Amino acid sequence: MTPCKEPPGGARNLLILTLSEFALIERLRRRLVGPPDQIWVGDDVAVVPAPVGAMLLASDAVVAGVHADLRLVGLDDMGWKAMVANVSDIAAVGGRPCCAVVTVAGPLGKIDFDLLYDGLTAASSAYDCPIVGGDLTSSDTLVVSVAIVGDGGGGDLPAPVLRSGARAGDAIFVTGPLGSSAAGLHLLQTGRVSEAPDLVLAHRRPRARLDEGTAARLAGATAMIDVSDGLAADLRHIADASGIGVVLERVPVAIGVNRVSNDPESMALGGGEDYELLFTAPDPDLVESTFAARGLGKPLRIGRCTGDAGERRLRDGELPALGWEHT
């Protein structure tokens, strides 16, 4: 795979360069197909059916040069990532996405917005989360901001799972091995894409774990977060919010990461953007049986929660301060 260049050029891009802001909005609006019971893009407000029970709201932004290097990935990858990062936040409380609004700020004469929306709409379709509106404005830096409304459910479902409910004695689980995205980014940065296309794809097109989030919620998860900042950082987030200690007994490293890094465990601990779900639960047998009953892979048990609120251990040593920090 050849690293993508931006802007891509071609006849489509030449057309976009000539469009006014309102004409571009209309062009993008025609790409969005919504359910018939919604008032669609064109009004300043989208009217959507309200969830029964808890309503979930998530918002996150992807900034070119900060969260996406457009010398290495395409605008469609940036759009995909912006949507999936928010869907993953909904998954991390055990909810389901309902709809999204997308705000894009960027240099209107230099960006192929159709390509950007290829990624946004592909992700919204993959996760059944229609784009119902948004905004478009001019900016020197490309920023894609997505806000999602989600359904937290009600009735017999347990409450949505926050990161603050872990208790001493809970086991710590993660839904899959880690480090794939960081390894893929490293391959892109070093021009070694052909060595492990699956790792590159894990970075370019991450996946949200919606079904796993629901299963963890049904299995009595007490705290949950998606692994976006890195296992070490996100485990600290749970421990800090819950006021408990944590002992990480094993670090599950994804297949192939050891071929990319001399320190694959550190890549798994600090790489981030894997979007696996990290959760705590008191009953490991219930976790295993609930995931199995829903046809999902067995979560990996990686540690335990303790009553010492200051404890942050990796095996017999200190949990390293790895991962992404938002400043």
Regions found by a protein language model. Give the residues of each.
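Glycine-/charge-enriched secondary-structure boundary and capping motifs
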Residues: G10-V33, V73, P107-V132, T137-V144, ...
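A short, well-structured juxtamembrane/interface segment
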Residues: R205-A215
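Glycine-rich anion/phosphate-binding loops
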Residues: D37-I39, L70-A85, G109-D118
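Glycine-rich anion-binding loops of enzyme active sites
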Residues: P49-V52, V62, R96-H186, R304
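A short, N-terminal amphipathic alpha-helix
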Residues: A82-V93, S124-A126
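Extreme N-terminal cap/leader segments of soluble proteins
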Residues: P3-E6, G10-G74, V93, V102, ...
